[in-house]
């Protein structure tokens, strides 16, 4: 067991601003030793994603207290079985990307090449445990729940081997961290589901970390136009700076009657999905990656889908197999075609995590990184 420092969400649904209500406290936590199929990782950096905020504001109800953070990278310090050499392709000292849905590799969902989220992995995430059901985080013997098998807003984490993908050392920690959620999710939706043809356009609704990752991934395709849609002018300007060919607010894109064969919704609000559906061209695909509250509903014309041969597809974790797809993103980044670092707005200290949640909720940041090194 070691003592670590971590950002623990104590209660759900605290009023804003979080800088005053302070629902997350940075505290000393006991971290148990890793078990056989687990790793101890020293966290270097962790990104602040809307899926963290959704736990804080109660849109996605999870058990508390929970140590948040699910987009992180760090260095492997120890294996659960005590070995120090290579194990399943990972060595002590390797930099690993932590991914927020472990794939068990054995269930029927795991046989779908990434299209369906792993069943035991999803069950563990919902229960706030590691894959296999364990909880390694405690405070005075009381359990602290894991966030999506990672809990990366901390100096160290114990994760299942299936939650870690090694990357070469030339991939810096801030790039590695973003590969684990924003890039895998937004980029994976483009590579694995949208896969635009030359001459087609890709529209992205919602230009936060996930949507911007979809934008930069779509820009890696030759002869593909990229359209960014967000309600905030600053986000439209940021997407243009990254190379988006056209940008619009939801009202502007509706008024202009624009249609695209591949449309990605990365907001997590029903109005944004309605915008995305209306933007989809005949024969096209609306790919939804946003995570609204479970009670959210949208209004759709079924006839529109049939008469125009359109489809609506949900994509979790970018429909990715992380061990297959993270190297694809690393290769694009190394070729200079995927500017992942451009998604970083600022670095914050662990103690400023409540303020970081306010910035994310206000829409004033793309990706903030919590620096733990
Ligand atoms: N499917 C997955 O595996 C997965 C993984 C990570 C995140 N997510 C979800 O993806 C969504 C985006 O995450 P993020 O971290 O990029 O969030 P974010 O808060 O950084 O970005 C959301 C963006 O949407 C914009 N927006 C809000 N309402 C809008 C509207 N009606 N129309 C157009 N734009 C609007 C905001 O201005 C903001 O720029 C969240 O719901 C998150 O929980 C899903
Ligand atoms: Zn995320
Ligand atoms: Zn599985």
Where are the regions that the model predicts?
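Short N-terminal strand-loop motif that marks the start
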Residues: 1-73, 78, 151, 155-159, ...
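C-terminal hydrophobic helical "lid"/dimerization subdomain
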Residues: 1-2, 274, 323-373
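Glycine-rich beta-strand-centered segment in the early N-terminal region that forms part
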Residues: 32-46, 59-111, 116, 124, ...
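Mid-domain Rossmann-like dinucleotide-binding core that forms the NAD(H)/NADP(H) cofactor-binding site
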Residues: 95, 155-156, 162-250
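Cysteine-cluster motifs in flexible loop/terminal segments that predominantly coordinate metals
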Residues: 100-156, 160-162
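A short acidic, Gly/Pro-enriched loop at the edge of an enzyme's catalytic core
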Residues: 254-263
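Glycine-rich phosphate-binding loop and adjacent beta-alpha segment
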Residues: 270-337, 372-373
